[in-house]
């Protein structure tokens, strides 16, 4: 999608002036997406789900060990990384989704209710992972309805009835 009005600059580039290919490359290199419903590809293993955006950006399989390292950082061992999404718990799926969002080393993470489908203990673990990523220099933009989750934010913007409140 493109802005209906105004300009959007990302990484010093005006996105209005970019063609679809340039926008795709910018998204692959600068933005990681963490979805509420994980959006893992059912036919791929956890490892392959994380590797997929890497292949899209680099046009080759990961030969650096980055996918394996990210999965390990998220607590997904080599045995679990071979499992399909439906064989993983909700918390494990969310960890895989976070690893996938990080695989291309984006500066920005867009997080849509990253703990919305998780129990309280797993939610806390996920928020600690995200807080650590922020401490390491990532920009996180997070949408949440959960007041506890919002306490992790440096800045809170409330939207009520479609307007910034």
Predicted regions and their residues:
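Hydrophobic anchor residue at the start of the ABC signature
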Residues: 98
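Conserved ABC ATPase "signature" region
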Residues: 13-14, 62-79
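Conserved catalytic motifs of ABC-family nucleotide-binding domains
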Residues: 105
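Catalytic Walker B motif of ABC-type/P-loop ATPase nucleotide-binding domains
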Residues: 109-112
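Short coil-to-helix segment of the ABC ATPase nucleotide-binding domain corresponding to the Q-loop/switch region
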Residues: 44-51
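Conserved ABC transporter NBD signature motif
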Residues: 6-14
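Conserved ABC ATPase signature
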Residues: 84-88, 92-94
């Amino acid at each position: 999608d493109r802005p209906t009005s105004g300009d959007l600059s990302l990484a010093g580039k005006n996105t209005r002036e970019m063609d679809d290919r340039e926008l795709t490359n910018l998204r692959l290199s600068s933005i990681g997406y963490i979805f509420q419903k994980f959006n893992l590809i059912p036919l791929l293993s956890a490892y392959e789900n994380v590797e997929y955006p890497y292949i899209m950006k680099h046009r080759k399989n990961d030969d650096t060990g980055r996918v394996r390292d990210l999965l390990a950082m998220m607590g997904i061992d080599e045995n679990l990384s071979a499992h399909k999404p439906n064989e993983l718990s909700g918390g494990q799926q969310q960890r895989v989704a976070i690893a996938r969002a990080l695989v291309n080393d984006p500066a920005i993470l867009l997080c849509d209710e990253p703990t919305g489908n998780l129990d309280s203990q797993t939610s806390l673990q996920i928020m600690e992972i995200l807080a650590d990523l922020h401490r390491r220099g990532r920009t996180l933009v997070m949408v949440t309805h959960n007041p506890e989750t919002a306490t992790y934010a440096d800045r809170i913007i409330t939207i009520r009835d479609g307007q910034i409140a």
